[in-house]
Amino acid sequence: HEHTDIRVLLTGEISDELFGYKYTDYAPSAAAFQTESQKRIRELYMYDVLRADRSISVNSLEARVPFGDLDFVKYVMAIDPEKKLNTYGKGKYLLRKAFEGDWLPESILWREKAAFSDAVGHSMVDDLKEYAETVYTDREFAERCGRYSYCRPFTKESLLYRELFEKYYPGQAGMIVDYWMPNRAWPHCDVSDPSARVLANYGASGQ
C-alpha cells in the first residue's frame, strides 16, 4: 500500500471450491465431486479465506471476494455436478463459458490454471524443497518426525515448516485442524505435496 493508491482488491478465492481444482479432474464420480466441493466450502475459514484476510489486511488493504457471494454459492452448488466434472478438456469450463463474448480477452478466459504456489515463482518453490533436503539427513528426518503424533510431517520440507511452527508456537499444533491436501483417496492424487504442480495433469499450467 506504500506504492499504490489502490485500497480494494478483487480476489478469486472460492472459485476452486465451487468449480473444481486441478485434482478434482480425477473425481471418480459426480457425487464424489459434489461431496468434495461441499467439504472444501465448509473448511474455507481455515484455509483460503483466512489466508486472503490475513495477507491482505496486514497490508492495510481490503478484499472483495465475488465468488463468495452467498446467492452465487447456493446457485453453483445447485447445478448438477455432472456438468461441473472436467469432461470438456478445460477446468472450470462453466465459469469460463459464462464469461465468453465481450467480458474477457480470449487469452485470459481460456488460459491454463496455475497453482497458487506458482505466484512466488517456480524457483522459490523448488529452492525451498532443495534447502529442506540439506537440513536433515534421512535418519534425522525419521527421528524428528517421530516426535510428532499430531499432524506428523511427511516430507523434509513439511518437517522444516513444522519445526518453525513449534519454535514460535510451541505446543499449539492442536489449533491446526487439518493439513490441506488433495483427496489422496482418489486416483492419481496420492501425493506428498499440496501444490497442483505435482499432479500428472498439471501440464503446461503456469507457463
Predicted regions and their residues:
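Cytochrome P450 catalytic-domain "roof"
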Residues: 1
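Adenosyl-5′-phosphate
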Residues: 4-11, 23, 29-207
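An acidic- and aromatic-residue-enriched active-site/binding cleft used to recognize and process polar
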Residues: 14
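Short catalytic/ligand-binding loop motif for oxyanion handling, primarily in non-cytosolic enzymes
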Residues: 17-21
